[in-house]
């Protein structure tokens, strides 16, 4: 099953999206956007930048949990991962984003 972007409108009228793997797990969460167009542009940026390993910044939370940030070519953050239990799990998450993002469909939902 292919991955998909879920584009959501929040109660505040702002937009964000999640990239879900084929198994339904969220593998990337976007920043918040003021407009629908901005969020769709963010999705296109994820599609464009996801295949390049150099666009991933690997980090560790204050609690020691690994996670990653996907950045656009201009250095702007376009998505963050969940917290992982290990670095190998985080690397698997990065590979999943690389695999799923370029061809993922967009599904729009409220909430």
Predicted regions and their residues:
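Acidic, aromatic-enriched beta-alpha/helix-loop junctions
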Residues: 36, 40, 50-51
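A structural feature that tracks compact, well-ordered secondary-structure segments
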Residues: 6-8, 14-22, 27-33, 42-46, ...
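Short glycine-rich, low-complexity/disordered patches
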Residues: 50-62, 103-111
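Mixed-charge, glycine-accented linear interaction segment located at domain edges/termini
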Residues: 83, 95-96, 102-109
